[in-house]
Swiss-Prot record:
Entry superkingdom: Eukaryota
Keyword Nucleotidyltransferase set for record: yes
Family classification: Belongs to the RNA polymerase alpha chain family.
Pfam families documented for this protein: RNA_pol_A_bac, RNA_pol_A_CTD, RNA_pol_L
GO biological process, one term: DNA-templated transcription
Domain topic, free-text comment: The N-terminal domain is essential for RNAP assembly and basal transcription, whereas the C-terminal domain is involved in interaction with transcriptional regulators and with upstream promoter elements.
Function: DNA-dependent RNA polymerase catalyzes the transcription of DNA into RNA using the four ribonucleoside triphosphates as substrates.
GO MF annotation terms: DNA binding; DNA-directed RNA polymerase activity; protein dimerization activity
Protein's UniProt name: DNA-directed RNA polymerase subunit alpha
Keywords: Chloroplast, DNA-directed RNA polymerase, Nucleotidyltransferase, Plastid, Transcription, Transferase
Binding partners and assembly: In plastids the minimal PEP RNA polymerase catalytic core is composed of four subunits: alpha, beta, beta', and beta''. When a (nuclear-encoded) sigma factor is associated with the core the holoenzyme is formed, which can initiate transcription.
Reaction equation(s) it catalyzes: RNA(n) + a ribonucleoside 5'-triphosphate = RNA(n+1) + diphosphate
Organism: Trieres chinensis
Length: 312
């Protein structure tokens, strides 16, 4: 059994507000680097919990296509801005926040009144501009979870008066890894695994690695402590379902399209990449107010960001 260990090589804040950290795991046997690297990457991106705004109730607003007199942004733009607020919480309970501000004023995240157990990581994050003496009043619904949840998947159907927001609970934004082969003092071939981790600031890369390690240990411990149930003949005869496109549930907001292209897609109820893949290039250009320029923007963004080409 090899005595491998992990060490933090560097950790620093970057301009976007993210925190970057680099780690190395040494003394791995050949072939272990790719296994451990993939395992850590998967857990860091998918299984760590976080907190996010999942819905808002704005005074005088009924739907996301509305506008508010005296507010520079429309509701869709405000919802997109709110999605970028990074929160961290000491509890996983459902919580509420409030904002009430009279203009003229520039509204940022630090204007939101929150429970004492919730902290805003990026308090200077821009929300909206009030150009007149009007009042902007918003109530926020805040939840904890893992991964990425589309609007409508996060809270109960009783909250019909809330405008729902796609929630990014993931504290880890990006993970890269690479493997180096080296010879130890005994001239045996070993591997070094380098992990590069970027978080949104709600936790440090060191905390992310610790949480991921605990998750992995807990997962495999359960396999040791519990007997696996016997497979029935019916379950043995079931075939595996076809793998889904990994990009299907990604919201179109992640494409960072122009406001015109984005609004056209939302009005056509195209909310995710999966919805977008149902359209051929010709059918997409038939959408109302969706011209050739917007279509080219969507095609180029899909190809460059996700490697997706819409089929005819």
């Amino acid at each position: 059994m090899n005595n491998f260990y992990i060490k933090c090589l560097k950790s620093k804040k970057v301009e976007s507000g993210s925190i970057y950290g680099q780690f190395v795991i040494k003394s791995l046997h050949p072939g272990q680097g790719i296994t451990i690297g993939n395992l850590f990457r998967r857990v860091l991106l998918s299984d760590l919990g976080g907190t996010a705004i999942t819905g808002v109730r704005i005074a005088g607003v009924r739907d996301e296509f509305s506008t508010i007199p005296g507010i520079r942004e429309d509701i869709l733009e405000i919802l997109l801005n709110l999605k970028g607020i990074v929160l961290k919480s000491k509890t996983n309970d459902l919580k509420f926040g409030r904002l009430k501000i009279k203009g003229p004023a520039v509204v940022t995240a630090n204007c939101i009144q929150l429970p004492s157990e919730v902290e805003i990581v990026n308090p200077n994050h821009y929300i909206a501009t009030i150009t007149t003496s009007n009042v902007l009043e918003i109530e926020f619904k805040i939840e904890s979870g893992t991964g990425y949840k589309l609007a409508g998947q996060t809270f109960c159907k009783k909250s019909q008066d809330y405008l729902q927001i796609d929630a990014i609970f993931m504290p880890v934004q990006k993970v890269d890894f690479k493997i180096e082969n080296i010879y130890d003092n005994s001239n045996d071939l070993t591997e070094r695994l380098f992990l590069d981790i970027w978080t949104n600031g709600s936790m440090s890369p060191e905390e992310a690695v610790s949480s991921a390690s605990r998750f992995i240990i807990s997962f495999f411990s359960s396999l040791l402590e519990n007997k696996l149930p016997q497979e029935t003949k019916e379950s043995e005869n079931k075939t595996l379902s076809a793998p889904k496109n990994p990009h299907t549930n990604i919201a179109i907001e992640e494409l960072h399209l122009s406001v015109r292209a984005y609004n056209c897609l939302k009005r056509a109820q195209i909310n995710t990449i999966g919805d977008l893949l149902k359209y051929s290039p010709e059918k997409l250009q038939e959408l109302k107010n969706f011209g050739r320029k917007s279509a080219d923007e969507v095609f180029t963004t899909l190809k460059n960001k996700l490697g997706i080409v819409l089929s005819n």
